[in-house]
Amino acid sequence: MIRILRPIFAVLVVWAFAGLGAAQQVVDKMVATVNAGVRTDLITYSDLMWQLALQPHTVLDNPTSDDLNRAMRLLIDQRLILQEAEKIPTIVPTQKELNDARDELVRNFTSPLEFQQRLQRVGMTSEKLTEIVEQRLKMEKYLDFRFRNFVVISQKEIADYYREVYTPRVQTRFPGRIVPPLEQVRGEIEKTLMEAKIESDTDAFLDTARERAEIVVLNPV
């Protein structure tokens, strides 16, 4: 359940930091709280900006309300998953997994320098980046544990997808090209169907979690 409160909660703290050589001030305010029965997590304006900074090609100067609201919805969903994930203490990323995930994140940008500059613009420290990466890995491991390990794709589903989706798609995109036989693309189709099922199961889980949780928007963005 989502409740919206008028912005009676004004300012938490004013952060001063340098961004691309120019000093900036960011007023950090409380944006929302999320409680899925484990604890109450606070989402701040800085959390939104950190989320945007980690999304390639997203503008950081004067972000639009749409961008901020997308970031807030994503963070709310992440908090819901994370609160569930932390009920399972064995879901802890290794140092290698953390390093690999961080390296993969950097590769989404044109260069390590661009990545570092974006972090500096929003005042994200190396420690905060590590915390965010660790949280993302915990969520990924939890979703794998909850959904991926139990997804079963039948041979009929694979055959149906090959006939009804894969073959027409190839014929439309590449007229005259011979469609690869089912056995050649079976693994690809199985992976596609598995990811679709996991996405559907995750969406259903989040719909239920949002209904059960206490989500309060303190300051609309």
Question: Residue ranges of each PLM-predicted region?
Answer:
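Bacterial N-terminal signal peptides
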Residues: 7-18
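N-terminal targeting signals for Sec/Tat export/insertion, comprising classic cleavable signal peptides
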Residues: 30-61
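Sec/Tat signal peptide C-region and signal peptidase I cleavage site
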Residues: 19-23
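Peptidyl-prolyl cis-trans isomerase
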Residues: 25-37, 62-221
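Positively charged n-region of N-terminal signal peptides that target proteins for export
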Residues: 1-6
